[in-house]
């Protein structure tokens, strides 16, 4: 060893004597050392499956660093699990390196070290550090969105809307993605590879006359949701039915590079574009109005995607001009400005603010910035809730093209005009009036209905002129070459188009109030001006069109549209908690809470028999009596009602987080029972229509996914819901006669409009829903014209409606048709003598709560003796049980079933039922004795032999907390679990407990109802 050291020392001395050129020699003989560990190491959990690690380069590495290796392993894991490593190449330009380690287990602690490596090999490991990934609960993706709603716009376009799912997961939703499938051709879903920021869109470029289904996914920072429930299958129109007319403003687009193809399940060679819809903040509850913004995307080349360049907001001078000869700024009733925004430059040089778009104005020259549908104000920044659209001469609203109308159509329009000229309606083969079209215009205060089947125009002019500022109704009808115009139900005017062609091709949208190309339509329609005024209603081919913006209504787009009813409630004075709402363009009603009525809710009243009116938007609400789990698999409703209209909702409830619902509706005079367990809707419809103005009884029941409907004495209708789910959960109230918001109802519920008529009885699972006590909210519910409203029952008696008649339920001590007789005119202290033998009428009862009585009908032994007579086969003689009754609750009962006497009891481990067969409803007096000793029971009737029985299980005591009832009880079916449906019809003369405890039936009773005096002993 000393020899080696000496040699090395000599070599070093030699190298130093050789000068700088010997440095390489010194390096060659130096022994290389390990690279030190990286510095400033930082760890952090990113989500439930990844963490980040950051470090800096080691100081004074002995040799150049080539890269790094991250070593990580689970803390406390099985030693058989190998340590994992992750290599990171060196980035020379960045002193600090950061890396993400993924594909980890949620909520798991990891031990992490890092080492640099060089030509000399692996460097020294850093000290181990620990990091724990986030728990699974904090990294949840969103729930699947609700089933999308699809409207077919044309032969190549559809409009989609959807609502978010029950949960957005552990992070806000970032965007949505849309997928589609053609069921007749495709086996896989095709993804539209674009991030949709809104909850509505329009897809273009689809195949004509083809079936499609659509689904939606939501994405947050933790991943995508499951695919939504697919939409219903829709079919695009045939080219002959409708075209793909442009119905939205044009936008500047820029062809840019798209994102990569990840996420595509199938790529078809389709050229599909879509239009994303922008929400308007004024709409609450997730239902959003929109404007259409064009984008294009070629699915055959997903990397090439059209991107929208949003309009630039700028402070530009606005020219306000007068109608003659210059246009001016106009305002709606609420003062929201509908600006002309006219500029003396073409659209190529004009910048419009957000929520507006530019059109060239050929009438005045220059260009105009128009607000999109649902926006107004000087910069189009104010929200306008549109229900009754208001037009200003350059406005318009678009709807889908006329469908199934090429041979015949009928259109009804109610409007109020403020100018002598203007275009009301237009739909045609193209935007410029060449070829096929139909139009309705006001020309010098006359209405002109024009249509062209391709070979000549028909012009039909109203015989009378309209009155400016007044409301008018016009009906247009065409069948082939022949047309008809009727104004205000006056004498129809007819006309005929020229030539032989009798069909019209409609490709453009249906324009209301004007058109974007109105200037070029003058030769076809007779005017180049837009309509000025309000439209209150529009119906096409018998179907009323909801003029609100899609997806709430059917309006697809529009420009510079106001709201006619705006400000109408500013001067309204609804009191007692009432709220104002517009019901027409120029009128309002107060939505009065329960117990108040009148134009301004000024009249207080007591609700007895509810009357609902569609015109007043009536409804009432009551909570479910029990928790939702009590109704998951079975529910039954009995309703007695009198309809004044053949359409409307009787009852509705639903679940906000799923597809579950149930509804009872009138549709075309028939009763419909609809329900959905979450996998498909069942629809049961009565065979015969109802007679309006008459009282009817209906019963609906659902067991799992099977339903039953019976109306009056009609044939019972049975049906089944689709799919495999069998339970319904409803977390909303039960809505009766209407609902607060018809936009929130389930799509297949059939709930379209309020009920008009009266409802006098609602029973749910044998439990009566009382109007006075159970209705918790509602609006504009008044009293029906019924005798019970006048409170005809005296002395505290309650009126029980029986269709158009009634019965009085009299308190103990009173009798008569109206409870007007007091103990048969005896004094109060002689009630006992007057009603020594009480008579029961099937809805009577006597109640006892004296502890000396109750202890004899409980415990280990019971002995009951009773003398009775009856003419009814069924009826309850005696009952004591828990209140409320639960499964396997203790009870003891005595009664008649189909003429036989039945003694039943349950000690908590099963029911004993001991029967004596016979016909004891013969109107004669009978003696019955029922004895229980522990589990054993015996019943004896008259001189018949005794019948015995024994309850199952081990329980021997009768433990009851309820009162004792004789002859019947309140809500008998509910409280006896349907063992008995009515009380005794007859008399009871003797009642003895424990062989020697005689009870005075009336004197000892604490309460009773409908007790009369029995005629003979």
Curated annotation (Swiss-Prot):
High-level lineage: Eukaryota, Metazoa, Chordata, Craniata, Vertebrata
> What S-S linkages are listed for this chain?
347-358, 352-369, 371-380, 534-564, 569-580, 574-590, 592-601, 788-799, 793-808, 810-819, 987-1014
- Intracellular or extracellular location(s): Secreted, Extracellular space, Extracellular matrix; Synaptic cleft; Presynaptic active zone
Give the organism, scientific name.
Homo sapiens (Human)
Q: Which domain of life is it from?
A: Eukaryota
Q: Which Pfam families match?
A: EGF, EGF_Pikachurin, fn3, Laminin_G_1, Laminin_G_2
Q: Where is the Fibronectin type-III domain?
A: 37-136, 144-239
Tell me, in a sentence or two, what this protein's role is.
Answer: Involved in both the retinal photoreceptor ribbon synapse formation and physiological functions of visual perception. Plays a key role in the synaptic organization of photoreceptors by mediating transsynaptic interaction between alpha-dystroglycan and GPR179 on the postsynaptic membrane. Necessary for proper bipolar dendritic tip apposition to the photoreceptor ribbon synapse. Promotes matrix assembly and cell adhesiveness.
The protein depicted here goes by the name Pikachurin
């Amino acid at each position: 060893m000393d020899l080696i050291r000496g040699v090395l020392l000599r070599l070093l001395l030699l190298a130093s004597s050789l000068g700088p050129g010997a440095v390489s020699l010194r390096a060659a003989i130096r022994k290389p050392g390990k690279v030190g560990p990286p510095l400033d190491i930082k760890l952090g959990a990113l989500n439930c499956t990844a963490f980040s690690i950051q470090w800096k380069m080691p100081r004074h590495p002995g040799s150049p660093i080539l890269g790094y290796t991250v070593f990580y392993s689970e803390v406390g894991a099985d030693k058989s699990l190998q340590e994992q490593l992750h290599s990171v190449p060196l980035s020379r330009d960045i002193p600090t390196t950061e890396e993400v380690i993924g594909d980890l287990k949620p909520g798991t602690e990891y031990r992490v070290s890092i080492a640099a490596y060089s030509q000399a090999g692996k460097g020294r490991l850093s000290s181990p550090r620990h990091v724990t990934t986030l728990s699974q609960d904090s990294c949840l993706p969103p729930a699947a969105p609700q089933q999308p709603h699809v409207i077919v716009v044309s032969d190549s376009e559809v409009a989609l809307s959807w609502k978010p799912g029950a949960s957005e997961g552990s992070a806000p939703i970032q965007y949505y993605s849309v997928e589609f499938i053609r069921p007749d051709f495709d086996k896989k879903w095709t993804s539209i590879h674009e991030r949709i920021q809104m909850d509505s869109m329009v897809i273009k470029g689809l195949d004509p006359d083809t079936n499609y289904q659509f689904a939606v996914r939501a994405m947050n920072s933790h991943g995508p949701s499951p695919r939504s429930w697919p939409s219903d299958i829709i079919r695009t129109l045939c080219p002959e039915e409708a075209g793909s007319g442009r119905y939205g403003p044009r936008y500047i687009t820029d062809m840019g590079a798209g994102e990569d193809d990840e996420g595509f399940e199938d790529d078809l060679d389709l050229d599909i574009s879509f239009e994303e819809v922008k929400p308007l903040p004024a709409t609450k509850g997730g239902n959003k109005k929109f404007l259409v913004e064009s984008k294009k995307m070629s699915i055959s080349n997903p990397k090439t995607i059209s991107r929208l360049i949003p309009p630039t907001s700028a402070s530009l001078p606005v020219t306000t001009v007068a109608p003659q000869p210059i246009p001016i700024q106009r305002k709606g009733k609420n003062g929201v400005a509908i600006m002309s925004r006219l500029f003396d430059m073409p659209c190529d040089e004009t910048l419009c603010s957000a929520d507006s778009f530019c059109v060239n104005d050929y009438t005045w020259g220059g260009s105009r910035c128009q607000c999109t549908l649902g926006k107004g104000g000087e910069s189009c920044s104010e929200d306008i809730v549109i229900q009754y659209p208001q037009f200003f001469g350059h406005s318009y609203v678009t709807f889908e093209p006329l469908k199934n109308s090429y041979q015949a159509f009928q259109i009804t329009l109610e409007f109020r005009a403020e100018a002598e000229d203007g275009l009301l309606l237009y739909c045609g083969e193209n935007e410029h009036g060449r070829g096929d079209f139909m139009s309705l215009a006001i020309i010098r205060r006359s209405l002109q209905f024009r249509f062209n089947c391709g070979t000549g125009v028909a012009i039909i002019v109203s015989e009378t002129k309209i009155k400016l500022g007044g409301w008018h109704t016009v009906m247009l009808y065409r069948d082939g070459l022949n047309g008809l115009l009727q104004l205000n139900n006056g004498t129809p005017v007819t006309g005929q188009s020229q030539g032989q062609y009798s069909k019209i091709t409609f490709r453009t949208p249906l324009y209301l109030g004007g058109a974007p190309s109105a200037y070029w339509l003058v030769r076809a329609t007779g005017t180049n001006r837009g309509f000025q005024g309000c439209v209150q209603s529009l119906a096409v081919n018998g179907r009323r069109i909801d003029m609100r913006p899609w997806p709430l209504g059917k309006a697809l787009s529009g420009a510079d549209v106001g709201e006619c009813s705006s400000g109408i409630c500013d001067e309204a004075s609804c009191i007692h908690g009432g709220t104002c709402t517009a019901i027409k363009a120029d009128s309002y009603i107060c939505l009065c809470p329960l117990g108040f009525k009148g134009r301004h809710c000024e009249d207080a009243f007591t609700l007895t028999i509810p009357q609902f009116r569609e015109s007043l938007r009536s409804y009432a609400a009551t909570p479910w009596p029990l928790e939702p789990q009590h109704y998951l698999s079975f529910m039954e409703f009995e309703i007695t009602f009198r309809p004044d209209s053949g359409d409307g909702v009787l009852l509705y409830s639903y679940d906000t987080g799923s597809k579950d619902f149930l509804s009872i509706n009138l549709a075309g005079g028939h009763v419909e029972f609809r329900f959905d367990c979450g996998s498909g809707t069942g629809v049961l419809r009565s065979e015969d229509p109802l007679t309006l103005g008459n009282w009817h009884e209906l019963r609906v029941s659902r067991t799992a996914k099977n339903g039953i409907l019976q109306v009056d004495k009609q044939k019972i209708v049975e049906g089944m819901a689709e799919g495999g789910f069998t339970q319904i959960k409803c977390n909303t109230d039960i809505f009766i006669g209407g609902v607060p918001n018809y936009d929130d109802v389930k799509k297949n519920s059939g709930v379209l409009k309020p009920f008009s008529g009266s409802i006098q009885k609602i029973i749910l699972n044998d439990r009566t829903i009382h109007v006075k006590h159970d209705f918790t909210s509602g609006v504009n519910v008044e009293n029906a014209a019924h005798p019970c409203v006048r409170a005809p029952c005296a002395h505290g008696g309650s009126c029980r409606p029986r269709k158009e008649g009634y019965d009085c339920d009299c308190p103990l001590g009173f009798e008569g048709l109206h409870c007007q007789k007091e103990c048969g005119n005896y004094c109060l202290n002689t009630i006992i003598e007057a009603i020594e033998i009480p008579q029961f009428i099937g809805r009577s009862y006597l109640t006892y709560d004296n502890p000396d009585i109750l202890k004899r009908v409980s415990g280990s032994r019971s002995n009951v003796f009773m003398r009775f007579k009856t003419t009814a086969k069924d009826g309850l003689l005696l009952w004591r049980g828990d209140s409320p009754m639960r499964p396997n609750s203790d009870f003891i009962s005595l009664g008649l079933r189909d003429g036989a006497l039945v003694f039943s009891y349950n000690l908590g481990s099963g029911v004993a039922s001991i029967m004596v067969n016979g016909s004891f409803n013969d109107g004669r007096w009978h003696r019955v004795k029922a004895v229980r000793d522990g589990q054993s029971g015996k019943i004896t009737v008259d001189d018949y032999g005794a019948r015995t029985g024994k309850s199952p299980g081990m329980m021997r005591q009768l433990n009851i907390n309820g009162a004792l009832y004789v002859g019947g009880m309140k809500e008998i079916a509910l409280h006896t679990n349907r063992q008995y449906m009515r009380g005794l019809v007859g008399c009871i003369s003797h009642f003895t407990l424990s062989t020697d405890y005689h009870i005075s039936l009336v004197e000892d009773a604490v309460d009773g109802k409908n007790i009369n005096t029995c005629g003979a002993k």
